[in-house]
From Swiss-Prot:
Protein name (database record): Putative 8-amino-7-oxononanoate synthase
Gene assigned in the entry: bioF
Disulfide bond residue pairs: none
Binding site for substrate: 23, 135, 364
Reactions catalysed: 6-carboxyhexanoyl-[ACP] + L-alanine + H(+) = (8S)-8-amino-7-oxononanoate + holo-[ACP] + CO2
Organism: Cyanothece sp. (strain PCC 7425 / ATCC 29141)
Length: 399
């Protein structure tokens, strides 16, 4: 036995490095946008979740400054003690209006919203069925709940139905967990099919709208609106930190669900309330989402333009080639790579060409990939330069 109780950490880190899984932070200087300063280099930003370009919007900045001047920098306590402000309820009402639900509840982060909500809804006598590619917060929330957790194959509604048929009757409650837009693939859950299956088996459904809110749907309400399912009873969780350009998370649903979570959700009860600045910025962002649909239109035009470029690349047209463009109906485009080393090589080549596009490697994803995030503020020239840089990087890797 090793004499030092922490000695294993260094060995574990070396294993990570040998597998090409090692990660480190990259410093962005200045305000976020379609172009940013990355470690002193001016680059095109295809790495951000700021899909509508609102994180640097002057209206959000002014709202945050005004709230800070009026209410201070911190909320100073939990919502049930000293942390509640009328601004929080204004944001919750705005989220409920956007999501077309009866009420909403704001959390300090989207990750915390998932952990806390899942733990409040199910326990050791219950069953969770989870898409195998769900976000870490859904997976971790399921694990911590104490419920029996079974994964179903990615987007496989037949597989989900089979698990329900086999296992549902053995448990008190059943909760289905799924992202609506999958963050590392860009594909979208077939929500009408899922709801039809789960309704037949008396199962609750929790959807994570993190990458759909502000992006999908006629008014930007997300994938639930996109699929025409706003009249269905389900639990919608999301974040304020992506298309809405702020920080925090939310749960939207029925009034009784939200009232229950205020009383039974540890991730909301026992944590400090969202800061006034973040709350005000998110509230301003929702107003922009509802009043400026052209941002979503431009975003989807950018996505379609880049998709068309990538689909025409010879390196991505071979059925069994080393590189593959994954199917996507969102602002996220992923190019699958054969291995972590190749992914790093392509990512470095893009960075040298002035393109910031992250490579995602195991264990975050099952296979290495280049993950591209499009923004409404990308110009046609930005998208064209991205296509040229990817063409060159893939050709260099093949040679």
């Amino acid at each position: 036995m090793d004499s030092h109780p922490y000695a294993w950490i260094e060995a574990a880190l070396e294993t990570v490095k040998r597998a090409h899984w090692y990660r480190s932070v990259q410093t962005i200087e200045g305000r976020p946008g379609a172009e940013v300063e990355l470690a002193g280099q001016r680059v095109l930003n295809f790495a951000s979740n700021d899909y509508l370009g609102l994180a640097g919007d002057q209206r959000l900045i002014r709202a945050a400054i005004q709230a800070t001047e009026q209410l201070g920098t911190g909320s100073t306590g939990s919502r049930l003690l000293t942390g509640h402000r009328e601004l929080h309820r204004q944001l919750e009402r705005a989220i409920a209006q956007l999501k077309q639900t009866e009420d909403a509840l704001v959390f300090s982060s989207g990750y915390l919203a998932n952990l806390g909500t899942i733990a409040a809804l199910v326990g050791p006598r219950d069953l969770i069925l989870s898409d195998q590619y769900n976000h870490s917060s859904l997976k971790k929330g399921a694990s911590l709940s104490g419920a029996k957790v079974l994964d179903y194959p990615h987007l496989d509604m037949g597989g989900l139905a089979e698990l329900l048929q086999t296992h549902r009757s053995n448990y008190r409650r059943c909760l289905i967990l799924t992202d609506t837009v999958f963050s590392m693939e860009g594909d979208v859950c077939p929500l009408p099919q899922l709801l039809a299956i789960t309704t037949a088996h008396n199962a609750m459904v929790l959807v994570d709208e993190a990458h759909a809110t502000g992006v999908l749907g006629a008014t930007g309400a997300g994938a639930v609106e996109h699929w025409g399912c706003t009249d269905q009873t389900l639990i919608q969780v999301g974040t304020l930190s992506k298309a809405l350009g702020s920080l925090g998370g939310y749960v939207a649903g029925t009034a009784v669900l939200i009232d229950f979570l205020r009383n039974r959700c540890p991730g909301w009860i026992y944590t400090t309330a969202l800061s006034p600045a973040d709350t005000a910025a998110a509230l301003a962002a929702i107003a922009v989402v509802q009043s400026e649909p052209q941002r979503r239109i431009q975003l989807h035009e950018n996505v379609q333009g880049v998709q068309a470029q990538l689909q025409n690349l010879p390196q991505l047209q071979e059925p069994r080639g080393r590189f593959r463009l994954l199917p996507s109906q969102s602002a996220i485009l992923a190019v699958q790579m054969p291995d972590p080393a190749t992914a790093l090589e392509v990512g470095n080549a893009l960075k040298q060409a002035g393109i910031f596009a992250p490579v995602i490697r195991p264990p975050t994803v099952p296979t290495s990939r280049l993950r591209l995030s499009l923004m409404a503020t990308h110009t046609p020239d930005h998208c064209q330069r991205l296509g040229v840089a990817i063409t060159t990087a893939l050709a260099r890797s093949l040679s």
